[in-house]
Amino acid sequence: MTYLQESSRPAVTVPKLQAMREAGEKIAMLTSYDASFAALLDRANVDVQLIGDSLGNVLQGQATTLPVTLDDIAYHTACVARAQPRGLVVADLPFGTYGTPADAFASAVKLMRAGAQMVKLEGGEWLAETVRFLVERAVPVCAHVGLTPQSVHAFGGFKVQGKTEAGAAQLLRDARAVEEAGAQLIVLEAVPTLVAAEVTRELSIPTIGIGAGAECSGQVLVLHDMLGVFPGKRPRFVKDFMQGQPSIFAAVEAYVRAVKDGSFPGPEHSF
């Protein structure tokens, strides 16, 4: 069996994401962890496939993402890359693997050798030096600000960020800092819609929202969440796209359409 797909669809590259932002075309991003789903997501025209440390939650059954290792991410990145998706392959740097710029570079090299085309790191102003270090060494970077799940204990739980005037100002400083350091993409998680809209206007790079309203340049969800495969209470920002659909492929197509036409997320999925 082979997972290689014949496709005339042009590959999504880092410059292509920037061009999409400038053209006003929304970016559809989903997490991806194996070759089978990578091939399916690619057929559904998902623009970016993220090998997220969320695999700790949805694959390993962990309560947080903290136990996920670099080897875990590298293994799943290689699985996704073997499907040769046309969408951009982005891999998370797990907790504890980018404490210094040198550590971050060593971790990024391992993931890029496994097939990643960009790495994602959680953090704002304090991370700018590391972002710059990576970009100067030809590592494309996606930053992640707002609710950063690796900081769950520091936050005292999974809480919306940027709700106060001071919090919103800090979030904007964080976003500007990583952009100025060279990040080419930024995820805004669990951020009030108005704050995320302001950040999106202020930056020149694409913003990807998850619980950050419809004004971002694109959206991301955890694959298992949007397919209705989640234990316990569904997060506010998640929509179950499997409802009313005959197949997983149809559900993913519905997600991509909803992101592209701006119907997802709605106010009920935002803060």
Swiss-Prot record:
GO terms for cellular component: cytoplasm. InterPro entries: Pantoate_hydroxy_MeTrfase (IPR003700), Pyrv/PenolPyrv_kinase-like_dom (IPR015813), Pyrv_kinase-like_dom_sf (IPR040442). It catalyses: 3-methyl-2-oxobutanoate + (6R)-5,10-methylene-5,6,7,8-tetrahydrofolate + H2O = 2-dehydropantoate + (6S)-5,6,7,8-tetrahydrofolate. Mg(2+) binds at D53, D92, E122. Binds 1 Mg(2+) ion per subunit. Pathway: Cofactor biosynthesis; (R)-pantothenate biosynthesis; (R)-pantoate from 3-methyl-2-oxobutanoate: step 1/2. GO terms for molecular function: 3-methyl-2-oxobutanoate hydroxymethyltransferase activity; magnesium ion binding. 3-methyl-2-oxobutanoate binds at D53, S54, D92, K120. CDD domains: KPHMT-like. The active site is at E189 (proton acceptor). Its cofactor is Mg(2+). Its EC number is 2.1.2.11. Keywords: Cytoplasm, Magnesium, Metal-binding, Pantothenate biosynthesis, Transferase. It is an enzyme of class 2 (transferase). Pfam families: Pantoate_transf (PF02548). It is found in: Cytoplasm. Its main location: cytoplasm. Belongs to the PanB family. Homodecamer; pentamer of dimers. This is 3-methyl-2-oxobutanoate hydroxymethyltransferase. It comes from Burkholderia pseudomallei (strain 1710b). The gene is panB.
